[in-house]
Amino acid sequence: MAYQNDVNFIREHVQELDVIDQLLEEIAELQIACCKRKRSLKGTNPTPWTADEAQQSIKEESQDVLNVLCAMGVFGFDDPEKNSTERMKRKMARWVNRVKMKKA
């Protein structure tokens, strides 16, 4: 319940436009981490980050994005009505189908 209390605190004390700014910042940081991961894996454009460091950054930035989405009321872990697990499963299945169709 502590997590939900923290989410509620943010909702009550941070204006929506500021939360949107926070989301944009976190998305940008996630994008940078993804670019670093790609560069480290490809190896043709060196980066000081190792692939493992970039992967860890992707995990961290993804969590930051999810936290902001929870604060916005778009996604929720504690509220079944806002938990998007079923929708995510359907979208993953569609993605798998598209990949399978391309390989066929």
Per-segment meaning from a language model:
Residues 1-104:
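Flexible "arm" and connector segments at domain edges
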